[in-house]
């Protein structure tokens, strides 16, 4: 397990680059973390990300964004959990897990979980598993871009995570 600790008034950007278990603890007031992971799985590759974010102090902030693209017979599993402990009000935490499937044999699973043990917090999650929308491909192809180039552009844009 890889563990990250964010202390009082500290700001961290944490990049998740490989399968594994991750723990992020916000241990002091004003601690902030931006957690980003973007993955391309091909052939029979399996990507498994288990991440737990624990708010252990008041007035903390996290934004966790995981994105994946699964091709061929690959699989992607995102398990994200946010815990806001007792007496940790005024904390904000957001978890997003999104996967694009590029093959009928590719697989994905997203499991966001929230455990809120106090009041006066903002906490939310979003999860989606989808294929590339035909309307996006059609739009790019109507501008003279080949289907393969259009798919590549959409995938590149999907995996390119902005830092907030």
What would you call each of these model-derived segments?
Residues 1-138, 142-145, 159-160:
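Conserved beta-strand/loop scaffold segments within soluble protein domains that form the structured core
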Residues 155-164:
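Short arginine-rich
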């Amino acid at each position: 397990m890889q563990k990250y600790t964010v202390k009082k008034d500290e700001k961290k950007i944490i990049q998740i680059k490989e399968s594994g278990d991750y723990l992020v603890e916000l241990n002091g007031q004003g601690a902030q973390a931006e957690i980003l992971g973007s993955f391309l799985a091909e052939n029979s590759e399996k990507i498994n990300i288990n991440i737990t974010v624990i708010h252990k102090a008041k007035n903390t902030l996290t934004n966790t964004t995981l994105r994946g693209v699964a091709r061929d017979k690959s699989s992607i599993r995102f398990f994200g959990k946010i815990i806001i402990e007792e007496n940790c009000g005024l904390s904000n935490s957001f978890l997003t897990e999104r996967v694009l499937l590029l093959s009928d044999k590719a697989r994905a699973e997203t499991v966001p979980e929230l455990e809120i043990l106090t009041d006066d917090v903002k906490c939310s999650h979003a999860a989606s598993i989808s294929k590339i929308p035909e309307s996006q491909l059609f739009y790019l192809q109507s501008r003279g871009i080949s289907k393969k180039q259009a798919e590549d552009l959409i995938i590149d844009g999907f995996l390119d995570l902005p830092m907030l």
